[in-house]
Swiss-Prot record:
Gene this chain is encoded by: mpaDE
Tree of life domain: Eukaryota
Pathway membership, UniProt: Secondary metabolite biosynthesis; terpenoid biosynthesis
Membrane topology (UniProt): Single-pass membrane protein
Lineage of the species this protein comes from: Eukaryota, Fungi, Dikarya, Ascomycota, Pezizomycotina
Binding annotation for heme: C449
Co-factor requirement: heme
Enzyme class: oxidoreductase
Full protein name: Cytochrome P450 monooxygenase mpaDE
């Protein structure tokens, strides 16, 4: 009997507690209007979110009740963007509500993981955000632009191969925009794409995993207490998959691979965002938690891609539906191309950052369809606040939905629900700032989105590339739909795509060249003699392996193989050795590759070339102090064993560990043991602390002889340890010869550029642009495509300097046009070799076009 009485007393006490809690909650906000059910329970909010149309219900509630509406017993929604600074101040004191607690990914072993965007603890937020904030500044983000260029190149290639020329077969363009956004962020974060673009599908189920995660947290965020029971309970997760598990698995795999490569002292550690995350934590182990890199990386994967794809789809849909705005944007891009040399294939940030109509379209897309469309909830601090002439006591959860703020008619006009980019044009500075500050898309105050600059960079580079190269038409626009599950996702952006013809050049207009960056080569009175040795070996190259796009008719290029004799007084070195005469004795895997991909004609050992020279030069193989490999591929390494053991072998970073032991000790090796047997091998380091380290243009460099006459340059990307060389050949006037190795295999990859636009009489008028290189480096062969692209850009700066003669290892246009060994090339400038040979590569283009005819 006593037990029964105790049970009843307990039950009554619980009921009374709940009743007083509801009454107190109802009473403290009783003057704030809203639906009756919402004042009593959060189930009203749950139902709105479950429909996938919560933003529409929120809009209707505010239309009915005004700018401040009660959405729950302790939750108030505000729609007036003028109070954004009040609710989202720059000072601490307005922590995020429990809605964000539900967005912490959970695993049974490690529990719930806070991240920059989901933590409520303001001190922890500062600890997580402050160390990495500078990485997301536009200054740092722009340094990663080549990584975005890499992904743009892959996207263009996939569109061409899959959808162009398919008789207007529709495809889901929205999916491909998302693939681009994810692979861009993957490259920025890991130096590796996830593979969405190459495979044309959701890799590892990441997209579905993120959508499932957001769908769950959207509902749980309305009743966060239940999330602790259902999603973050170690017992229940024995029987169900934890939230965010799939994304965390991808993150953990990437991190473990990177940590493992570092522990093994592998040299190919990229300076991508993951490496920077790990470096930051390692340099501050006492102040930064060991799990911080995991949290930072999770944020990049989870929030850094889907939200950007959302804006891309919004902008693309509205441009395709409103063709007038599409024409206006394309006209601006064409003007930038014609006047400022904007590249079609890889529009640069400098070329697109300040285009007014492009900027207006991006802002309008951000305004009209923000990626997150539920209120950004904050907890009112002690003392309460007054918003919209209404007092909110401490502890009240208050928030503004970006969807409502961004469409406020008092701020943006009666057509706030319409796509109209022109609303952003011809504004005073004051009015422009007012509109920008009224957009809540990236948040406001202390918790603004870190990834904003990355998103803007990707979008402003993507759309010029698409609109200058393709004609895109929407198919069945009525099938375009949206769903709001915290993420505001779009579906059904079906389109057809056609390649636009290359623009006709206006030969009456001289293209104005931009001034290239200063090379800042250290002054010196020392020079070397440079002789180009044509080894006599010819290689048949497949163009698609080395550059894009393919040109019909240009199916094969027969290329020479050059190496260089560098003489500093009585000291002589060779830069590369071409192909060894007995190439059939190379490792079997290399021989098989050669037989399947190329044809070698008339190979000669460079030692024989030197020893059989009948000129008065008199430099023999025994006189060679060192052989310098630009890299370790078969067509550059020759046969070092034909030189005396006293000849040193000099190689780039990482070659020693990557290539030896050689064959046959290592049956998979691509080099032979005899290449280094009995010989000193010196590996060049470009670390700033090394003796002779310097900077040449954008290249890290080493002064080889120590007198400023000859530099080795870190020309990474094509292969491990790839290097170039720069020789000072005259001092009055000063001139240099740059030896590019295999940085690229066709001068059309280097030219034209904004620094070096093609002259009016340089070739066929169907070329893409006067200041846009004819070809882009193919991603097929480089071991590090991003670094390879960066190297090409660095060479373009050298190539634009009238004092530098750029020689590529396989440039057939030089044969018969310049002096070869045993003559030296030091007088190239006096003989105007640069001017005479710079545009000869256009002959390949003309032959290709003629062959197509």
């Amino acid at each position: 009997m006593k037990s029964l009485s105790l049970t009843w007393i307990t039950a009554v006490a619980v009921v009374l507690y709940l009743v007083q809690r509801y009454v107190r909650s109802y009473w403290r906000l009783k003057d704030i209007p809203g639906p009756v059910l919402a004042k009593l329970t959060d189930l009203q909010r749950v139902w709105w979110v479950k429909t996938g149309r919560a933003h529409e219900f929120h809009r209707d509630m505010h239309a009915m009740y005004g700018p401040i509406v009660r959405f729950g017993p302790n939750m108030v929604s505000v729609s007036d963007p003028r109070v954004i600074p009040t609710i989202y101040p720059s000072r601490p004191g307005f922590p995020k509500g429990d809605f964000y607690r539900t967005q912490k990914p959970y695993t049974r072993n490690k529990g719930a993981m806070p991240a920059v965007f989901n933590t409520q603890d303001e001190d922890l937020h500062k600890q997580l955000r402050s160390p990495i904030a500078s990485l997301y500044s536009m200054t740092n983000v722009v340094r990663l632009e080549p990584l975005v260029d890499e992904t743009l190149t892959v996207l263009s290639k996939q569109l061409d191969e899959r959808f162009v020329g398919t008789n207007d077969k529709p495809f889901d363009l929205g999916d491909w925009l998302q693939y681009f956004a994810f692979d861009s962020m993957g490259t920025l974060t890991f130096s590796r794409r996830y593979g969405f673009l190459e495979q044309g599908r959701d890799m590892h189920g990441i997209l579905q995993e993120i959508w499932n995660f957001m769908t769950r947290v959207a509902v749980m965020g309305q009743i966060p207490w239940f999330d602790e029971i259902w999603n973050k309970n170690s017992f229940i997760t024995l029987f169900k998959r934890p939230t965010g598990f799939g994304v965390l698995k991808v993150v953990d795999n990437f991190i473990s691979q990177r940590v493992s490569s570092r522990e093994n002292d592998e040299k190919a550690d990229e300076k991508d965002m993951l490496s920077q995350f790990l470096d930051i934590q390692a340099s501050n182990p006492h102040s930064i938690m060991p799990w911080a890199p995991r949290a930072w990386t999770f944020s990049n994967v989870m929030a850094g891609s889907d939200s950007t794809a959302n804006v891309m789809r919004t902008m693309m849909y509205n441009l395709l539906v409103d063709r007038d705005t599409l024409r206006s944007l394309r006209a601006e891009l064409l003007e930038a191309e014609n006047s400022n040399g904007l590249s079609r294939s890889l529009p640069s940030w400098d070329g697109v950052r300040s285009l007014p109509y492009l900027d207006a379209c991006v802002l309008e897309a951000l305004r009209l369809h923000p990626p997150f469309c539920l209120p950004f909830e904050r907890v009112v601090p002690e003392g309460g606040i007054t918003v919209c002439e209404t007092y909110l006591p401490a502890g009240t959860v208050v928030g503004i939905s970006p969807y409502l703020a961004n469409r406020d008619k008092q701020t943006f006009g009666d057509d706030a629900d319409k796509w109209r980019p022109s609303r952003w044009l011809d504004l005073s500075r004051e009015d422009r700032v007012k509109l920008e500050n009224s957009i809540l898309t990236f948040g406001a105050g202390r918790r603004t989105c870190l990834g904003k600059n990355i998103a803007i960079l990707e979008i402003k580079k993507l759309f010029p590339m698409l609109l200058l190269n393709y004609e895109i038409e929407i198919v069945n626009p009525e099938n375009y739909q949206t769903t709001n599950a915290w993420f505001f996702r779009q579906w059904g952006l079906q389109a057809v795509i056609r390649k636009l013809p290359a623009p006709e050049r206006d030969d009456t207009i001289e293209q104005k060249a931009s001034i290239p960056p200063a090379l800042n080569i250290p002054p010196s009175s020392s020079t070397v003699e440079v002789r180009i040795i044509d080894s006599g070996t010819l290689l048949d190259l497949r163009p698609d392996l080395f550059w894009t796009p393919d040109l019909p008719g240009l199916l094969k290029v027969t290329a020479p193989t050059y190496c260089f004799l560098i003489s500093n007084g009585t000291r002589h070195v060779l830069f590369d050795l071409a192909v060894r005469q007995d190439w059939e004795n190379l490792p079997p895997s290399i021989v098989a590759m050669i037989k399947s991909q190329t044809v070698i004609q008339e190979p000669r050992n460079i030692s024989d070339v030197l020893d059989s020279d009948e000129s008065s030069l008199g430099v023999r193989s025994k006189d060679i102090e060192a052989i310098i490999w630009s890299h370790a591929h078969f067509d550059h390494i020759g046969d070092p064993s034909t030189f005396p053991p006293s000849t040193e072998l000099v190689v780039g970073p990482g070659i020693r560990d990557t290539h030896w032991p050689g064959f046959p000790t290592n049956p998979d090796a691509i080099n032979l043991n005899t290449d280094i047997q009995g010989r000193n091998v010196r590996e060049i380091s470009f670390e700033k602390t090394q003796k002779g380290a310097t900077k040449i243009g954008s290249f890290d460099a080493v002064d080889y002889f120590g007198d400023g006459s000859f530099y080795l340059l870190d020309a990474a990307g094509h292969s491990v340890g790839h290097i170039g060389a720069l020789a000072r050949v005259t001092t009055s006037p000063v001139s240099f010869v740059f030896m590019g190795g295999d940085s690229c295999h066709h001068a059309g990859v280097l030219r034209p550029t904004k620094y070096l636009p093609c002259p009016l009489d340089s070739g066929d008028t169907s070329l893409p642009c006067k200041s846009d290189s004819v070809f882009t480096l193919s991603p097929a062969l480089p071991t590090d495509y991003t670094a390879a692209l960066r190297t090409v850009e660095n060479i373009k700066e050298l190539d634009a300097c009238e004092d530098v003669f750029v020689v590529l290892a396989h440039d057939a246009t030089l044969k018969g046009k310049v002096d070869f060994y045993p003559s030296k090339i030091n007088d190239w400038k006096a003989k105007e070799y640069g001017k005479k040979t710079k545009w000869l590569f256009y002959k390949d283009i003309e032959n290709s076009i003629e062959g197509q005819k």
